[in-house]
Amino acid sequence: MNIRFDGRTVIVTGAAHGFGRAIALAFARLGAKVHACDILAEELAETLRLCGDAATAHTLDVRDRDAVQRLVAEIVGRDGAVDVLVNNAGGVCGQVGRPIEDISPSDWQVIFDVNLSGAFYMAQAVAPGMKAQGRGRIVNISSGAGLGISLTGIQAYASAKAGQIGLTRQLAHELGPWGITVNNVAPGFVRSNPTTERQWDAMGPEGQKRVLDGIALKRLGAPDDIANAVLFFASDAAGWISGQVLSVDGGK
């Protein structure tokens, strides 16, 4: 299978490190014009350096609907309609697992804002252009927590990622008549960024062994494993696949 994205315009959110950086690099290597977006400007600059001339960096908070609309309008004005959107921005926002009675409304809401509302705002912004050209690919990055439970016990994270999977399925049916596919990649635990490194260390040797014992392949994955799944969903080879969730977790 020869996958290329020459001449295609791709937006990747959460591109400053981890999955997002790997996804942006993968698209850049395959000929795409990549718009790498993140709120972390310093780390985003490193992604841009690695991607080279194939990428443009944009400091963006996906929770800000107006900023999202402005950025997509700018990209469309420069490159034409967006061909591929990868909603990767997300995370636990610095939180750790705590009892439900200790969770404040703001603790709950901030995780929903970045993991679910951000994906909604981005899809909402690119949809008109994709409809106009009669094609498009939206790939949302959720988590195994959205299909089962959160390893870290963060209620809002598991709930927001489950909600993102529901959004994926709903948008697949809504946007399908315009040739737009919407799919979801649900990663297992991957040591891909500072947060997951802290989580891994906090597990200790026994907890780490339990995680590995629960994986069929008995090893953790890498960011490139997630990027490869995204490339497939974004490619012409996946043109008759929509509304699907692909677990990339080494086997559970």
Please name every model-derived segment.
Residues 96-100, 104-109, 211:
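Substrate-binding pocket helix/loop in short-chain dehydrogenase/reductase
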Residues 2-3, 92, 96-97, 230-231, ...:
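Short C-terminal tail/terminal secondary-structure segment
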Residues 123, 160, 168:
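Active-site helix of classical SDR
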Residues 143:
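Residue(s) in the substrate-gating loop at a strand-loop-helix junction
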Residues 176, 181, 186, 241-243:
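Short, small/polar-rich loop/turn modules that mediate ligand/substrate recognition or access, typified
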